[in-house]
Amino acid sequence: MNQNISLTIDFVKKTLEGAEAGHDWFHTERVWRLAKLIAKTENCNQEIVEISALLHDIADPKFHNGDETLALDISEKFLNEIGMEAQVIEQILFVIKHISFKNKGETLEKTKELEIVQDADRLDAMGAIGIARTFNFGGYKNNLIYNPDIQPNIH
């Protein structure tokens, strides 16, 4: 395993210690493993895919008062500390900045690396674990599971 990836794993594990269960190391590890698997079949920069996947939820805005710059700042500082090249850092930060579900309507020239990490993150949102993550986050935010007084929002 590449040293930068090993250092990133250690950093992410330490940083996400005690994080909300739906956005913890185990989620990050699943996304990383899925991204690695997808990347093997694509023409992409494997290191950018792996490090982006590892850092994608390092400071999720949902848990930091909506601050969308914190993850970028933390990631950039860390990547500079481990001596990554500026061009590679820029590409990783691009993925982290644009991975969010809420950016899906935006016109954006996506890189292959961004598409891979987005797909991996979205795949982790499916199935039993994805459903469990959704309920866990709702509980974390003290949301009701169901309220018959709230009518569905039909589009």
Name the predicted role of every residue range:
Residues 82-118:
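Hydrophobic, well-structured mid-protein blocks that either form specific transmembrane helices
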Residues 3, 7, 30, 91-94:
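Generic alpha-helical secondary structure signal
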Residues 46-64, 71, 92-102:
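His-Asp-centered metal-binding catalytic motifs of divalent-metal-dependent phosphohydrolases/nucleases
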Residues 64-68, 128-129:
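Conserved strand-to-helix beginnings and helix N-cap segments that scaffold or border functional pockets
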Residues 2, 16-42, 55, 104-155:
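Divalent metal-dependent phosphate-bond-processing catalytic cores, especially two-metal-ion Mg2+/Mn2+ enzymes
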Residues 31, 67-81:
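An active-site-proximal "capping" alpha-helix that borders the catalytic cofactor pocket
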Residues 7-18:
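Generic N-terminal amphipathic, Lys/Arg-enriched alpha-helix
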